[in-house]
Amino acid sequence: MLCPLNRKVEIRNLFIMAKFQFSTFIFHLSKLLVGATFVFSGFVKAIDPLGTTYKIQDYLEVMHLSWFSELALVASFALITAEFLAGMLLITNVNFKLGLWLSSLLMIAMTPLTLWIAIKNPVTDCGCFGDAIILSNWATFWKNIVLDVLIIGLWLLQKRLYNPW
């Protein structure tokens, strides 16, 4: 004869296990989505680094910082490398925490920039994905908000779920 108390414990354990599996699924899905976005963005920009340089120069010009234009090529390669590296680190789990920090820092810089671009509309295209995918300024901002939410989720879940092996 089954004890009702044991049955409640079994149901509770099943609920806890399902909750853990759902959290694990969300963690890995978020990691793949953020990582793939950064890898794709870095890869597309790497195909045409001069195009990225010109886009950075456009941004510097509308912000009245054209005297930084000489550093646009260096900034282009730094951005390409940072995006691609952040994505690869998240996807491959080689150094997940570094990838999470790098993607967080990129989004801390890019989200306010895209909000300003969406409100003021100084450039027609953000250049997030080079010439492969052209997004409106507001679409870019909302894409960044989604990435921010996913990255916050990764920060919240990583302590409980992250296992490098």
Residue ranges, per PLM feature:
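Functionalized membrane-embedded alpha-helices
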Residues: 26-46, 72-113
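Perimembrane loop-to-helix junctions flanking transmembrane segments
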Residues: 53-70
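Membrane-embedded alpha-helical segments of integral membrane proteins
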Residues: 108-162
